Each structure stands twice: as structure tokens, then as C-alpha cells.
Amino acid sequence: YWGDKTMAEKEIHTRIPFCDLQIDRQEIYRAMGYREEVPEIQFREMVETMLEELAGLCRPQGLYRIYDGQVVDSGHIEVGQISFRVGKIIAPCFDKAEQFAVFVTTAGQEYDGYVKELKAKEDMVSVFMADAIGSVIAEACVTEVIKRLEKQIPLRHTYPYSPGYCGWNVKEQAALFQLLPENPCGVKLTDSCLMLPVKSVSG
């Protein structure tokens, strides 16, 4: 959260150059199931090849809006006059928060197209690896948006939290999207509250 109520901008939508993303290889390996281990050289080389290909394809984006808000009780917060049941793990983290940054980031439709081509080739090993890479790209987009927000509003803030984690019901994604423009960054919400493109993050 950011505690200053005087801001030059209430909404920022930005394209994120792939080269600006901090892609942690070890996070990719963890997503592939290696934990703290390092995969065999051929798999590491495949990861690097995929990252090079995706760097030329992906058009990562991010958007955030700033809203006034408050903690209502031990499990609820109110943001932009919308109530969220975030649960008893997340709500205390927003203690004394006066403003909230509602955000969405995405690796983009180009990533989905890349994976679709791999599936068409029935290259399931590459599909598995691309899925791990896509998850790390999406989280790296969140980190980059936070950096840009920090430069604009250099105040203390919490970690980002998303529906579906730490006891926050994923169905509240629908309410969250009410605080964002229609199809923010090209991201659409399905009836089951999943986001398309698939490698997107909101919170």
C-alpha cells in the first residue's frame, strides 16, 4: 500500500520490455520440479533457447490503479468501495493501509501462441518447460510493475497478494476486475474466474 493521498497519476498502463524482466533461472528450475537442484545441461540449454525465442515474441504488459481503502476487520478489506474477503492471513498485512494499488500483469497473447505451436507439434517436454518459464515471466512482470510504482510513489508498501493464494478465494477475481478497465492489458476473465492469457497475474 501507499500512504500518501496526493498523487499525480491514478492509473498507469505500461508495456514492459522483455529485457527489463529479471528472469531467475533457479525459479524456472523450481517450477520444473528441481527444487534447489540444477537440471541436466540439455534442459538448461532448452530453457535458454526458449527464453531467447520468447524474448523476440512476448509483449509483456502491466497496469495498476490506485484506490483509497481500509481494513474492515480481521478478514476483510474495502478497496474503492468494494469489499473483499481476503482472509485472516492477508488482512493483517494491510493494517493502517490507506491506499491500495490494484494491478494486472501478463506475459501476453504471444506467449499463448508460442505454447499452442508447441502443443501442435506434440512436444510435451517443451510444453512443460514453457509453462514453467511462463509462470516466472508473469511473476517477473509483477516485480517490474512494482519497481515502476515505487519510482512514481516512493513510499512503504506490502508484498503483492492475489486471489487464489493465502486463503483469498479465486472467485473474488471478478470483484477485483471491477476496479480495472475492461480487458486490462488484453486480459479477460472467464466465468470460472481464470485469466486469459493464461500467464497473467492480478492482485
Model-identified regions with their sequence ranges:
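Active-site helix-to-loop segments that bind/position phosphate- or nucleotide-bearing substrates
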Residues: 7-127
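Short, Lys/Arg-enriched N-terminal segments with co-localized hydrophobic residues
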Residues: 1-6
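A broad, structural surface signal
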Residues: 48, 52, 56, 139, ...
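Compact, glycine/acidic-enriched structural inserts
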Residues: 124-147
